[in-house]
Amino acid sequence: VHSKKHMTRTTRAGLGGRLLSLGAGLCLAGGPLWAAQSEDGDTRLATVVVEGAARSEAQKAEARLKKVPGAAVVVDNKAVEKGRATNAEDVFALQPGIFAQATSGSGANKISIRGSGLNTFYQGYALGIRYLFDGLPITGPGGTQEDYLSMNGIDHTEVLYGANAFDYAATSLGGAINFVTHSGYTAPGNYLRLEAGSFGYRKQQLSTGGVVDDSDYYVSIFHNERDGYQHDTPNKGQELVANLGHRFNERLDTRLIVRYREETLTQGNTLTREQIKHDSNSNKVPTGRKKDGSTWVGSTTTYRFDDDSRLQVGLSVNDYPLLNGWRYSATPQDWRSTDTNLTLRYLRSQDRLFGLPSDTTLTFSSTRSQFADVKSHSRATGQLLQHTDYTGSRDTVFAFGNELQLDPRLWLVSGLSAINIDRDVSIEYSASANTSEFPSAVSYNKWYAAPRIGLRYQLTPDIQLFGNASRSIDPPVTWQLGSTGVPYIRPLTPQKADTLEVGIRGSVGVVDGSLTLYRSWVKDELLSVVVRQATATADALVANSNASPTIHQGIEAGLGIQLWEGANGDRLDLRQAWTLNDFHYRGDSTFGDNELPSLPRQVYQAQLNYQRHDGYYAELNARAASSYYVDYANSLGAPSYTLWGAKLGYQAPGRRWEVFLDLRNLTNEHYATAANTAYDAKGRDSANFYPGDPFNVTAGVAVRF
């Protein structure tokens, strides 16, 4: 993306000048194991019986991700459900390095990890991150459908930053997010949850789960509605989640997961800074999208050859229609897509390589668009305006990974991914003639390599150092090459990045934390710009292109402190997260070293939580975001903001029932939650900002029976 004139970039915060002191650690109580000596003098180990609660699936995932030589976190939904639990903004709060904000308070979310999908627009798809359900991808050649990011029926969520998502065949700059569905083991019994709040928000959930002999089941239904803060922005959805598992014997088990969701959503138009301040619920040009039934069916089967090796076979089908612009748009579009995926994983642990302990993983994942196209029509006449076809496009990854234990404290992690990108995009019909220099069809099949190497060092039993070097490959999704806005296909090349990452994580006493620094040298970054804003008579026009070389670098820091613990078990805890984003051009011929727009330079989050031993809890939280540019010329910035919130609640023993009150934006701040990206705003206040919700309250109650 290039501008027409150069503007001097404002000074960025240097990485070297930003440090966050992190203590680490939780005191673990333990006792000695004494050797018993028999009467004849033989020394034998005494039998020790350890009793305690079994680890949850989220805790098991957290222990597994500690072996990753880079940033990776697990979000347990039990913690999320102590307040409003409706979208990605709720789930990823207090996670450094992750930007997740709802646009206009709706289910459309801007989600970015380390600047991935930097200026994605919000019309049904998410970019820059590989999303999965239970290890099977929902991201395909056309991107990821936002309606699948409802966060319903989830036990926990794994977030692996950048190349640390290697084992999930993720090769994107942002890494991967894996949503793990509840099963009959994690959510037994019957469960009813009701939420209601400001701006007509309502959500209902009813689920049942259990274990019968060698089988387990979980079935849940959801319904959500919201009238909206901006005028005329209602949205509603209903969803079914089912998870059925069966264990045939000690070697073989299988699981079938089904997700079905219907959704209608009306999005408010973006506003100027002046409107954000004085008329933030204005909505002159609403847009709407409708999903009349997205269906994802996935199956995973695991065969254990022995205690140390196993094969996982995954199959999935993803059918996702999208009626974009079904309300108000002058040229509504009908998107129809069906993807299939095959995933194979072979895992070998407790092996030997060069005489050293070794774990090896082989992964194959291929997602193909069996059918994919978009048709646009004139609302006034019903005439077909354009038909663009994407059928046959495919993303395939072969990955080999190994973890080699060099000594009792040091592990070498290496890997290589071979990536095959197949794009087949053609305009089958257009009412407008193609008079541009670009073709009406693009078809290519290319291979890329993405190596990875890292080290993990156990400094103490509770403190870990890590570092890695990697390459990421982000192919353009099909519709970025061309959809219905123009009668030509714009050839785009995959985005490539080389990344260095170092960090520390662990715990000491009552303190735990993590600190990660990274720098990515990006080539051909895929960037978007809103060329024309939507009006009452014309739809928005968004252009995509490969940029000149850019830099993505930053600091991600998290810190947790137990401030106080009473004799009866009452606790006071403070959690903090700080993110520094520094994304900019590298000597662009027009932009120089200008900042890349769309994400805050700094984000600070904090949560002070008081938990009583009898189940009552109270929380005070804060989120502060700095200003950032919304155009490549760096002439117009989003205002900074600070939001305060609070939670009150009670959980009965065993969580048999619970109730909460979630208060947000206590000071009624008028702010922009996210922004579109302009080419050159020329310093003029323009409509690029999504308004955040003012003061709002959500109440909820849940019962297990």
Where are these regions (language model features)?
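Extracytoplasmic beta-strand/coil segments of soluble accessory domains associated
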Residues: 57, 89-136
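Short acidic/polar hinge/loop motifs at secondary-structure boundaries
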Residues: 121-122, 129, 134-161
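Membrane-embedded beta-barrel scaffold of Gram-negative outer-membrane proteins
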Residues: 304, 310-324, 368, 458, ...
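Gram-negative outer-membrane beta-barrel transporters
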Residues: 412, 420-421, 519-521, 543-631, ...
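Structural signature of Gram-negative outer-membrane beta-barrels, strongest in the C-terminal barrel
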Residues: 249, 352, 356-367, 389-523, ...
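N-terminal periplasmic "start-of-domain" segments of outer-membrane beta-barrel proteins
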Residues: 47-83, 109-112, 129
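Transmembrane beta-barrel wall of Gram-negative outer-membrane proteins
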Residues: 189-191, 196-225, 230-267, 288-310, ...
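C-terminal beta-signal and adjacent terminal beta-strands/loops
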Residues: 473, 523, 627-629, 650-705
